[in-house]
Amino acid sequence: MFEARLVQGSILKKVLEALKDLINEACWDISSSGVNLQSMDSSHVSLVQLTLRSEGFDTYRCDRNLAMGVNLTSMSKILKCAGNEDIITLRAEDNADTLALVFEAPNQEKVSDYEMKLMDLDVEQLGIPEQEYSCVVKMPSGEFARICRDLSHIGDAVVISCAKDGVKFSASGELGNGNIKLSQTSNVDKEEEAVTIEMNEPVQLTFALRYLNFFTKATPLSSTVTLSMSADVPLVVEYKIADMGHLKYYLAPKIEDEEGS
């Protein structure tokens, strides 16, 4: 049997908000080490990888590995019934075709119990190679979300240019163009407000803003976001989930000759 209890249930609510608009259904791989999810988005352009380590839960039990096919829209609807302060418990029997979700109010005066039907999903796991990146930018997640949102009003794609002194986001469209440059911050009291750049070589890559705006739905999970870039490989947008794991999005760069399309 599988049972996982999360006192800070709002984390699970935020994870589903970050996934549901990008992926309709996905397989949750449950093992003794934790919960993993890996899925291409519905249009097979981007890839999502979620890790929630078992030690991040308040109690965690998994007797044998499970692969649970979940409709994320359905799960999100059920999690909307949980209060932000609620304690959430997930429970499934070893060969169950349902997942139980239990929401307990902190004062223990209210307990809600839901059961969600699971799906049979045929999922292929893609190997994600570990690699070194030419440029790694860490910045406030709210700032990144705002830049993506603002530049979406200008064009469909953003050019991210990374150099030692700063990172530049540029977009152009019928109304003109826009550029936003963030300089590396040297002395910031709060780490979550810093912009740091680790660069081996400069990069300049173009990405579809539509997908970046989907990724930034994960902003409530973390005060910072990390962008890892190299020429000709997918961008990695990573949100750390405190003491639990991470949510990573992968997006291939647009090829220059696609620009006009």
From Swiss-Prot:
Q: Which UniProt keywords apply?
A: Acetylation, Deafness, Disease variant, Disulfide bond, DNA damage, DNA repair, DNA replication, DNA-binding, Dwarfism, Host-virus interaction, Isopeptide bond, Methylation, Neurodegeneration, Nucleus, Phosphoprotein, Ubl conjugation
Query: In UniProt terms, what is the effect of altering M40A?
Result: Complete loss of interaction with UHRF2
Q: Which InterPro entries does this UniProt record tie to the protein?
A: DNA_clamp_sf, Pr_cel_nuc_antig, Pr_cel_nuc_antig_C, Pr_cel_nuc_antig_CS, Pr_cel_nuc_antig_N
The Gene Ontology biological process terms listed for this entry are:
base-excision repair, gap-filling; cellular response to hydrogen peroxide; cellular response to UV; cellular response to xenobiotic stimulus; chromatin organization; epithelial cell differentiation; estrous cycle; heart development
Q: Where is this region: Interaction with NUDT15?
A: 7-100
**Location(s) in or outside the cell:** Nucleus
Q: Which GO terms describe its molecular function?
A: chromatin binding; damaged DNA binding; dinucleotide insertion or deletion binding; DNA polymerase binding; DNA polymerase processivity factor activity; enzyme binding; histone acetyltransferase binding; identical protein binding
Gene Ontology, cellular component aspect: centrosome; chromatin; chromosome, telomeric region; cyclin-dependent protein kinase holoenzyme complex; extracellular exosome; male germ cell nucleus; nuclear body; nuclear lamina
Q: Which residues carry this modification: N6-acetyllysine?
A: K14, K77, K80, K248
UniProt-reported outcome of changing S228I: In ATLD2; a hypomorphic mutation affecting DNA repair in response to UV; results in significantly decreased interaction with FEN1, LIG1 and ERCC5
The UniProt similarity line reads: Belongs to the PCNA family.
Free-text function comment from the UniProt entry: Auxiliary protein of DNA polymerase delta and epsilon, is involved in the control of eukaryotic DNA replication by increasing the polymerase's processibility during elongation of the leading strand. Induces a robust stimulatory effect on the 3'-5' exonuclease and 3'-phosphodiesterase, but not apurinic-apyrimidinic (AP) endonuclease, APEX2 activities. Has to be loaded onto DNA in order to be able to stimulate APEX2.
Q: What else is known?
A: Antibodies against PCNA are present in sera from patients with systemic lupus erythematosus.
What is the name of this protein? Proliferating cell nuclear antigen
Give the organism the record lists: Homo sapiens (Human)
